[in-house]
Amino acid sequence: MRKLANGDQELQELTREAHSIRAEINRIYYDSPVEAQRLFEELVPGAGVGIDFRPPINIDYGMRLSIGDRTFINADLLIIGGGFVTIGDNVWLGGSVTITPGVIIGDNSIIGAGSVVTKDIPTNTIAVGNPCRPIKPIPEG
């Protein structure tokens, strides 16, 4: 995938398209959840199966986002910037979480409400805060 620069016509079009889709998801979610889920999968082609989310969601570049299976996204998620973001399988994102470009959140992790994730979070970890930091491992099993 080539790097897109600010002012790039392709970047502007991708941004407009993503904003349009996310606005529609946020508008119809409670009246048409199946259609909202379909639009989410269009917005985020790298979305796994069994993802559960609550609006509003704010995702700038869904094509630069990978979300693993069985992930829960609480209300008011913000993923900003054009860097690739990876969210593992079975992750729980609390309400009002912000994720910055380039972050990887490991499988089976929990990100507390209001956290601002600026660095990678290991697998099987509870992490909270601004900036978000690991506070406790989650035992496997």
Task: Identify the function of each model-found stretch.
Residues 49, 54-55, 60-61, 68-69, ...:
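Left-handed beta-helix
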Residues 1-50, 132-136, 140-141:
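Terminal amphipathic alpha-helical/low-complexity segments used for targeting or macromolecular assembly
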Residues 2, 9, 27, 63, ...:
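Short N-terminal micro-motifs specific to bacterial/archaeal maturation
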Residues 44, 66, 113, 117, ...:
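Alpha-helix boundary/capping detector
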